[in-house]
Regions:
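Terminal processing/anchoring signals of secreted or surface-associated proteins
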Residues: 1, 20-22, 51, 123, ...
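Bacterial Sec-dependent N-terminal signal peptides
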Residues: 1-29
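Membrane-proximal, proline-rich intrinsically disordered regions
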Residues: 20-71
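A structural signal for short, hydrophobic/glycine-enriched beta-strand patches
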Residues: 29, 57, 69-100, 187-189
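Secretory-pathway/luminal and periplasmic proteins that interact with or process carbohydrate-rich
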Residues: 56-61, 76, 157-170
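Conserved, well-structured interaction surfaces
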Residues: 89-165
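Short coil/linker segments at helix-helix boundaries
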Residues: 165-193
Length: 193
């Protein structure tokens, strides 16, 4: 009988404690609402650091857009493209052979594109709040520095996407100047397209 009472008490406590809304409404520490994040100068700094962290990834300037993928496309490396006796082929074999429709290359190109636009989306999110929350900065000059850095990074990322993905202006007797190139995104939307 005592065991039954103990089990009933434990079960009742479990149900009472897990049924509480505060226990169920838990968000990760790294996941913050935009209003909370951009309510302090430190939040804007965190957002800026987050953009730089995206830019340091291996599918961005941490490898592919510095010494990796682009250098292979430019044929800076004279790597053996054939399989060696150990079965090794280098990571950029398909890129060196201009096989862009291979799954690995499509994935690499897609990750470069999406990583850049993810950074642009983070910048645009910060730009929604930067003038509205001008008072959280220690001085107007600090506000201007943050805003300028966000704007410069957005322009830089768009230019790099243009450089990588737009048709050459010199193509087809300079008709490339009139060709559609890339989307210029200056407003944050949370809608998948």
């Amino acid at each position: 009988m005592k065991k039954l009472i103990n089990k009933t008490i434990i079960l009742s406590l479990f149900v009472a404690l897990t049924g509480c809304n505060d226990w169920l409404d838990v968000s990760p520490k790294a996941d913050r609402k935009a209003e909370d994040l951009f309510g302090t100068e430190a939040g804007f700094r965190d957002a800026l650091v987050g953009v730089y962290a995206l830019m340091c990834g291996t599918n961005s300037y941490g490898r592919d857009l510095t010494y990796g993928y682009l250098d292979v496309l430019a044929q800076y490396y004279n790597s053996p493209l054939k399989t060696t006796s150990s079965g090794y082929e280098h990571n950029f074999k398909n890129a060196a052979e201009y096989k862009y429709t291979e799954k690995t290359e499509e994935s690499r190109i897609s990750s470069i594109w999406s990583n850049h636009f993810s950074a642009v989306a983070n910048i645009n999110q910060a730009m929604l709040f930067i003038d509205e929350n001008k008072g959280v900065f220690t001085s107007p000059e600090v506000h201007d520095v943050y805003k300028g850095e966000f704007l410069a990074l957005r322009a830089f990322l768009h230019f790099d996407i243009l450089r990588l993905f737009a048709p050459s202006a010199a193509m087809n007797n300079n008709k490339g100047l009139d060709a559609l190139a890339i989307p210029y995104v200056d407003v944050f939307t949370n809608i998948a397209q």
